[in-house]
């Protein structure tokens, strides 16, 4: 994809912590002009991140989404045109939305643009149905999410999460980790205030394995991915354990240096209560890129991939599975297993996913010509 003007509408603002929409924006900016729209706020400005990538801050009046559909579209059309005029934004060729709460009809920016709705999370709102109806194509990282839109005529495709190319870079700078270097090292990447954290199970695992070093990489307070911390007391509780090390948020480009130090990875969300929400976490590929074993709650998209991850159906069984794996970590990290995990991650880079998306877009556009 080259020479295009692309708007990306994100529910998470630009910041240190990257998820799919940030990675896509960064990659697309290498050969296109990308405008990354932060979620609405009281800020109104546009600024450069790097060549080809600008961040757009804007405000929207409250209550628009409670209006009747026809009135909402009229008002959003006026607001979109005003926003483009005030920021001197060029007409987009592609409008790619990850956010169902703003501009459900993307044609308000340009009726001739290709309109993409990309659902990477479960959104509890009927507004998402309008996004699907008005899009030219819908993508999602999980089949379970797409199942929610069954029967709707818009073309839909499951596209796995992507892996940034720097996770495959063999030239990794050395980093020093706190704690006894002889201990098994287990990593976790993500927001410790994520709404679906299973702290009861996590704390049990941490307490039962005091000779293992647990490294938590990611924000443990407010961040660009979550502005209202929920589990501050739980974070403080695990922080007091001698075998727990909170390393804080790290830029995506620095993560490989830390991940490649680990012997295993742990994921511990309340997945059985939120199967669709947990259907395909993006961090899985980052873990698999190291080749090391991943012990996790239930992940529907990987339910048939026991060759890649060690997974439980219920978190009741997670502590015992974790104990089994770390007691025999060398068995779970044989050369053949490591190679298989790495190959899977390499097949799912953002570059490869973007190629799949571009092929789909060409097919859809040719059918509408």
PLM features: what roles do these ranges have?
Residues 1-45, 207-209, 213, 369:
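N-terminal subdomain of nucleotide-sugar transferases
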Residues 15-19, 194, 253-258, 265-286, ...:
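Nucleotide-sugar-dependent
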Residues 126-129, 163-182:
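Acidic anion/phosphate-binding donor-loop and adjacent secondary structure
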Residues 144, 162:
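Carbohydrate-associated surface elements
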Residues 178-197, 202-206, 214-217:
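Conserved donor-binding/catalytic core segment of Leloir-type glycosyltransferases
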Residues 218, 229-256:
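Nucleotide-activated donor-binding/catalytic signature segment of Leloir-type glycosyltransferases, i.e.
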Residues 330-364:
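A charged, aromatic-enriched C-terminal amphipathic alpha-helix characteristic of glycosyltransferases
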